[in-house]
Amino acid sequence: MLIKLPSASGSKESDVTPESIYLSRRTLLASSLAGLAVTALPRWASAADASRYADVEAGKAPGWFADKLPSTQWQAVTVKDEAITPFKDATHYNNFYEFGTDKGDPAKNAGSLKTEPWTVVIDGEVGKPGRYALEDFMKPYQLEERIYRLRCVEAWSMVIPWIGFPISALLKQVEPTSKAKYIRFETLEDAKSMPGQRSDFALIDWPYVEGLRLDEAMNPLAILAVGMYGRELPNQNGAPLRLVVPWKYGFKSVKSIVRISLVSEQPKTTWQSIAANEYGFYANVNPMVDHPRWTQARERRLPSGLFSPNLRETKMFNGYEEEVGSLYAGMNLRKDY
């Protein structure tokens, strides 16, 4: 489907206090574009553009990323009347169980992950399978900044400025066969650098696996991200390559991807394997379908705290119903959650 993008609107930035209260899936583990806008800014064209991320901690960008960054299409997609979550909070309040189950564990432990060199395998039902160094994998793609809402299944949310490219561009390159119906994503499995994979949480069968229907992956909102906040992805946020599907709960957006497979059958995903009654394959943000242990009708937008929870009503498809609703026409979204 095509996205009709209305006129540009600005996203505000504001400070945020660290989150102190959150819902967590650790209990389970231990027990067994609406409002979109587009504007083309082909490079860091002005001091104002660069200053938006002046407070962002500098990373160690790989050469290929540094070379591509100046031609990024800045603010290619934005959201109206939304404050961008400050970088510190977006990088220190994370779910990435490969590095631990507490929200601060990924930032504390992910420094051990080596992201250079990095290899991505493309296989399955494609005309052009291959094994690529990440710098070669990225060569064909124009980077875009996409400012998206992020809604976690745990009922908290952020607004993140990602840098990446549409999955549809990748699919055009690899040429799916007529048998391809789904796309399967696989995270790195490396217990040496990922301490969470060495833990006693045997319920997770590594590597982490996620998937999309092919038409979902083709939607213009679905991207593969390599950066955020004007720089490369930090390790704790899924470096060097992660999925971003803003109308779905955050656990669908698999991190540190090493394999992308086109398949004919619906892949069995990690959380679906652990608790299918709680985490379905589709995982679309839906305020009408509660998690068995908490409501999904509301969310806590960071910043929030004990005395300032910053609650808001959750929007269908996380506010992207106009862009993605037709993908699920005729489906029972209570059954296919």
From Swiss-Prot:
Binding site for Mo-molybdopterin: N94, Y97, E98, C152, T187, N237, R242, S253, V254, K255
Pfam families the record matches: Oxidored_molyb (PF00174)
PROSITE patterns: TAT
Cofactor binding note: Binds 1 Mo-molybdopterin (Mo-MPT) cofactor per subunit.
Catalytic activity: L-methionyl-[protein] + a quinone + H2O = L-methionyl-(S)-S-oxide-[protein] + a quinol; L-methionyl-[protein] + a quinone + H2O = L-methionyl-(R)-S-oxide-[protein] + a quinol
GO BP of this protein: protein repair
The protein's name: Protein-methionine-sulfoxide reductase catalytic subunit MsrP
Native source organism of the sequence: Pseudomonas syringae pv. tomato (strain ATCC BAA-871 / DC3000)
Gene that this polypeptide is encoded by: msrP
